[in-house]
Amino acid sequence: MKNIRNFSIIAHIDHGKSTLADRLIQECGAVSDREMSSQIMDTMDIEKERGITIKAQSVRLNYALNGQNFVLNLIDTPGHVDFSYEVSRSLASCEGALLVVDASQGVEAQTIANVYIALENNLEIIPVINKIDLPAADPARVKDEIEHIIGLDCSGAIEVSAKTGVGIKELLEAIITRIPAPNGDVSKPTKALIYDSWFDNYLGALALVRVYDGEISKNDEILVMGTGKKHIVLDLMYPNPIAPIKTKTLSAGEVGIVVLGLKNVSDVQVGDTITQSRNPLKEPVGGFERAKPFVFAGLYPIETDKFEDLRDALDKLKLNDSSISYEPETSVALGFGFRVGFLGLLHMEVVKERLEREFDLDLIATAPTVTYEVIQTDGLNLKIQNPSQLPPVNKIDSILEPYVKATIITPSEFLGNIITLLNNRRGIQTKMDYITTDRVLLEYDIPMNEIVMDFYDKLKSSTKGYASFDYEPSDYRVGDLVKLDVKVAGETVDALSIIVPESKAQTKGRDFVKAMKEIVPRQLFEVAIQASIGNKIIARETVKSMGKNVTAKCYGGDITRKRKLLEKQKEGKKRMKAIGKVNLPQEAFLSVLKID
């Protein structure tokens, strides 16, 4: 056990985690040069296309130093804020972490968030300054930043270039000499934490575990403590990006895959504890938090008969991504669909894209919302994720909305833009700190609802892409909120309702109906598009009717003849207007998302 090192790589997006992982894998010879591809740890197509890591991946590396053979378990983590729970999960199973910082960009908001998770887990952190081959690289400035913001001693920081391979050997030596070996006891009852699980079409549900004490062998009967179920171990493997390597036992300190031949991944939930059924543990491994969805949106199939296909697709996707929650819902406008909970906006995009790609579905997504708490006049508390669940106005005492604590790091020249943006989004400043003469760290409390739409894009565009942003949920606060409904031809379209602050309702309503007017196709009758709060109409636009020239067949002659025809047409239009139905195109639902 003294020759095992468990470590993960933490970094902000685009600071070169996956490339560094590639170099370490190559240096240790875990994958032959012929099989090597760039970002080998990113297995999903979406990951490679977007250049992001979504699922944490593991690999077991062998490395010899001073005549001794060492086993290095590398766990690659995502960098994006939506997937930070993947990070906390990965770090819970390590003794050390490589903090990778781009030598030209410096410390970013995400870097700080991930470091705090690592420090809470008492990990040994090795600062790694990456991309030193870039012309704009300034390792000395970056070391100062790490010391100033995070307070880590950077005298032993290692400078590498993952692209060219400079400094990789020194890094491997540092991992072995500075990260402590796992401490566990093989003679104690078996204690293993499931820190990832996924579904394999041939082997069933697989659990990736970190063994703390004892050991697990093939054919053992094990107990999954969360479910209380017993299973036989069919196979054990070490993770490897090309093909896992089989083994007979996993003992204390090791990381490996347990094959139990289960049909359902919910039997091996992430964060659960595995122990031997003949000599079980008294207490499961603690300190592990489940991922809670923050953002909710309705997903509906465009072809209504594909509802069951969507249910199957969500069931299968949940096997690999336990953080999704979903329940069926119906909408007058869109038919049958699901209310799906996500970790954040990027997660929502990725899930929708995976459903459309991997399961060949066409979906409509409604505007994302957060969970509100409603206190009714009769004292009852409700939690709602869908604006249409809001009780009537006279029954509401107050509405509470979730707030987040946001950390933003930006070049100081954009400070004015950012403060304006945050004030428009009802942000409350709690801290402002100059890291260096030209970079500022801001902390704000912001309603979650204000960042769930397009905040990230607006932040990037108002700072030319230089600002970085991270958030964590904080608390619920009373808000001055109302429900804004949209009526088309007198019918309320439930899928377009949103909850907004009263101060913004008027402008939001006006923008809403303007955008809708451009999209609703012209009918043979006039269509009124209205925005309302309760029974009060606050904005209206009219889509003019298409005219048919009924007087074309009259040549000259009496004006009363023409008037009679026009009156008759008017009557007909009135009747049509009373019973006419308007079909809304898909863009109508998307336009709601675009309104600022």
From Swiss-Prot:
GO cellular component term, pick one: plasma membrane
UniProt-annotated location(s): Cell inner membrane
Residue intervals of the tr-type G domain: 2-183
Coiled-coil ranges per UniProt: none
Residue positions binding GTP: 14-19, 130-133
A biological-process GO annotation: positive regulation of translation
Function in brief: Required for accurate and efficient protein synthesis under certain stress conditions. May act as a fidelity factor of the translation reaction, by catalyzing a one-codon backward translocation of tRNAs on improperly translocated ribosomes. Back-translocation proceeds from a post-translocation (POST) complex to a pre-translocation (PRE) complex, thus giving elongation factor G a second chance to translocate the tRNAs correctly. Binds to ribosomes in a GTP-dependent manner.
Protein name in UniProt: Elongation factor 4
Keyword match Hydrolase: yes
Source species: Campylobacter concisus (strain 13826)
Enzyme Commission number: 3.6.5.n1
Gene: lepA
PANTHER family from the UniProt entry: TRANSLATION FACTOR GUF1 HOMOLOG, CHLOROPLASTIC, TRANSLATION FACTOR GUF1-RELATED
Pfam families linked: EFG_C, GTP_EFTU, GTP_EFTU_D2, LepA_C
Keywords: Cell inner membrane, Cell membrane, GTP-binding, Hydrolase, Membrane, Nucleotide-binding, Protein biosynthesis
InterPro entries the record matches: EF-4, EFG_III/V, EFG_V-like, EFTu-like_2, G_TR_CS, LepA_C_sf, LepA_CTD, LepA_IV
Enzyme class at the top of the EC tree: hydrolase
Catalytic reactions of this protein: GTP + H2O = GDP + phosphate + H(+)
Sample GO molecular function, one term: ribosome binding
UniProt membrane topology term: Peripheral membrane protein
TM spans (from-to): none
